[in-house]
Curated annotation (Swiss-Prot):
<dbReference type="GO" id="GO:0045158">
    <property type="term" value="F:electron transporter, transferring electrons within cytochrome b6/f complex of photosystem II activity"/>
</dbReference>
<dbReference type="Pfam" id="PF03742">
    <property type="entry name" value="PetN"/>
</dbReference>
<protein>
    <recommendedName>
        <fullName>Cytochrome b6-f complex subunit 8</fullName>
    </recommendedName>
</protein>
<keyword id="KW-0249">Electron transport</keyword>
<keyword id="KW-1133">Transmembrane helix</keyword>
<keyword id="KW-0934">Plastid</keyword>
<dbReference type="GO" id="GO:0015979">
    <property type="term" value="P:photosynthesis"/>
</dbReference>
<dbReference type="InterPro" id="IPR036143">
    <property type="entry name" value="Cytochr_b6-f_cplx_su8_sf"/>
</dbReference>
<keyword id="KW-0793">Thylakoid</keyword>
<keyword id="KW-0812">Transmembrane</keyword>
<dbReference type="GO" id="GO:0009512">
    <property type="term" value="C:cytochrome b6f complex"/>
</dbReference>
<comment type="function">
    <text>Component of the cytochrome b6-f complex, which mediates electron transfer between photosystem II (PSII) and photosystem I (PSI), cyclic electron flow around PSI, and state transitions.</text>
</comment>
<keyword id="KW-0472">Membrane</keyword>
<dbReference type="GO" id="GO:0017004">
    <property type="term" value="P:cytochrome complex assembly"/>
</dbReference>
<comment type="subunit">
    <text>The 4 large subunits of the cytochrome b6-f complex are cytochrome b6, subunit IV (17 kDa polypeptide, PetD), cytochrome f and the Rieske protein, while the 4 small subunits are PetG, PetL, PetM and PetN. The complex functions as a dimer.</text>
</comment>
<dbReference type="InterPro" id="IPR005497">
    <property type="entry name" value="Cytochrome_b6-f_cplx_su8"/>
</dbReference>
<keyword id="KW-0813">Transport</keyword>
Length: 29
């Protein structure tokens, strides 16, 4: 696995996680 693709995967994962966290916060969990 390339280090660049690994970094992109981590970035997308953290972005999706934070996005879902914001959505949950707006819905009152």
């Amino acid at each position: 696995m390339d280090i660049l693709s690994l970094g992109w995967a981590a970035l997308m994962a953290s972005f999706t996680f934070s996005l879902s966290l914001v959505v949950w916060g707006r819905n009152g969990f």
